[in-house]
């Protein structure tokens, strides 16, 4: 009798933990390598253009930004 109760409680606990874990990971990607690949693709150093507030002396500004303040130190990408 005690063993049956322990087994029932264990099954209920494992079922509840599976449901909680499934709900938590619903919007996350399954494979860590895919997430890392996306992070490397969006890495700041991998872009070919300067973002807002970055210098435009050595690289062009990203689309939608303009190089402003082209003094002696070069300009800054701004809207």
From Swiss-Prot:
Residues excised as propeptide: 23-47
In-chain residues carrying the UniProt-annotated modification 4-hydroxyproline: 60, 63
Keyword Protease carried by entry: no
Protein name: Conotoxin Vi6.1
Entry comment, domain topic: The presence of a 'disulfide through disulfide knot' structurally defines this protein as a knottin.
Keywords for this protein: Disulfide bond, Hydroxylation, Ion channel impairing toxin, Knottin, Secreted, Signal, Toxin
Cysteine-cysteine disulfides: 49-62, 56-67, 61-77
A GO cellular component entry from the record: extracellular region
Pfam families noted in UniProt: Conotoxin
Compartments it resides in: Secreted
Signal peptide extent: 1-22
Organism this protein belongs to: Conus virgo
Reported function: Ion channel inhibitor that inhibits the increase in intracellular calcium upon depolarization in DRG neurons. In vivo, both intraperitoneal and intracranial injections into mice induce hyperactivity.
GO molecular function: ion channel inhibitor activity; toxin activity
Keyword Secreted appears in the UniProt entry: yes
InterPro entries given in the database record: Conotoxin
Family: Belongs to the conotoxin O1 superfamily.
Expression tissues: Expressed by the venom duct.
